[in-house]
Amino acid sequence: MDRRRELLERKVELERMLAEYKESNRIQFFQPFEHQQRTLDLINAGKKVVLLQGANQIGKTTLGAVVVGSACLGIQPWDMRPTVWGKRKVECRIICQDWEHHADGVIVPELKRWLPKGRYVVRKNNIGVEAYWEFPETGSTIELMTDSQPTELHEGW
């Protein structure tokens, strides 16, 4: 009976560890919807401009987070395929409508939800929004900006 109890406790512990791993590395377990996969196929085919539009809650923001995240990681963690950008340093910009609602309320939580914990370092801007994300392994970055910022700030890096 003790052996059975030990095994049951071990099973519960392993299930807890797996759930924790999945939560911290959600991008590895990303399963694209059909319309998301079609968009990924276009990106992976080298298309320079791709548009995914549609109703609320169809996964547009999620897809944006995993595409930008995989570009910064240098690999698509959900299928282990290389990205079209390879493992080189990439600099990504996400243009938000505003800092408080869109950047801080939508984009930052989605990036945190999908990007693997411990693989990036975040810095806040002067407003307190986590607007600069750096991936030390690749040197890649994600910079959040708003469309209300002066045009000069959007020019170049």
Predicted regions and their residues:
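Phosphate/NTP-binding elements of NTP-utilizing enzymes
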Residues: 1-157
